[in-house]
């Protein structure tokens, strides 16, 4: 049996001691799970789901805590201290996560957050982080289709908009002119694939694309008007920011939804807003 450092493992309890229990680590031998992390009803023979990392003395140790990032993942973490060797990030465990100076794009500062990738150092076998995230993003062409829902981590502001890490693997872009809310580096959210371009890069949107989104929004808009005494003080001339603040959609989607309801004679348009047709 082989274990995975920096990830969760299902390991068997093989020994009980005063300061915790030992787990079967296969070729790595017995691994300590300290008392503070041992479940109350734990007994020999039980299998526990534990995260494995190296403690302050570089010994393999287990915990039932869930870290903010695992090996092979990206996250936005805060720097808690620095020394002559690099920076240390809070990742939710007793031992902080190390970022060598060689893996920093700029000198990291205490109190600031940075998007990083966690991995195993080839030489020391330690779990370390790198702010040079580009090298850890997949170069393969994504197998996404237009409209696919994905999880994203906002990574970097550019002249075009915001770069995002998609599903912990690919790079994508949210265009500035399609963003109607405040985004910041480190934010995690759902997004939708607009297209995978010929060069393999992914264009993203925060609104569900296509007719399904419009149909969904038409229903949302109609229900909203009904729930607000049959009137809203928005129309197709309202600022995009006001529309997004109310409904979380672009002005284009809003106008199509309004048009759909108007064609069905469900609403009446006014200079100062919209009412139900029978209001």
Regions found by a protein language model. Name each.
Residues 1-279:
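Single-stranded RNA-binding regions, centering on S1/OB-family and related RNA-binding modules
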């Amino acid at each position: 049996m082989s274990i995975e450092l920096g990830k969760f493992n299902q390991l068997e309890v093989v020994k009980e001691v005063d300061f915790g229990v030992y787990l079967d680590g296969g070729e790595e031998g017995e691994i300590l799970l300290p008392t503070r992390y041992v479940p109350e009803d734990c007994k020999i023979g039980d299998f526990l789901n534990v995260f494995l990392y190296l403690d302050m003395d570089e010994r393999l140790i287990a915990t039932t805590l869930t870290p903010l990032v695992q090996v092979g993942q990206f996250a936005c973490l805060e720097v808690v201290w620095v020394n002559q060797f690099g920076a240390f990030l809070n990742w939710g465990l007793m031992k902080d996560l190390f970022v060598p100076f060689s893996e920093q794009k700029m000198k990291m500062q205490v109190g600031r957050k940075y998007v990083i990738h966690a991995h195993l150092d080839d030489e020391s076998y330690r779990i370390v982080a790198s702010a040079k995230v580009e090298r850890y993003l997949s170069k393969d062409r994504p197998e996404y289709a237009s409209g696919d829902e994905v999880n994203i981590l906002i990574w970097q502001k550019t002249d075009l908009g915001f770069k995002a890490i998609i599903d912990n693997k690919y790079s994508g872009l949210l265009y500035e002119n399609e963003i109607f809310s405040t985004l910041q580096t480190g934010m995690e959210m759902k997004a939708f694939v607009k297209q995978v371009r010929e060069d393999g890069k992914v264009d993203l949107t925060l609104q569900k694309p296509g007719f399904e989104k419009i149909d969904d929004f038409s229903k949302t808009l109609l229900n909203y008007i009904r729930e607000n005494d049959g009137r809203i003080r928005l129309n197709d001339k309202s600022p995009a920011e006001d529309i997004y603040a109310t409904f979380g959609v672009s002005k284009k989607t809003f106008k199509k939804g309004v048009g759909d309801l108007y064609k069905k004679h469900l609403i009446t348009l006014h200079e100062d807003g919209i009412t139900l047709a029978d209001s």
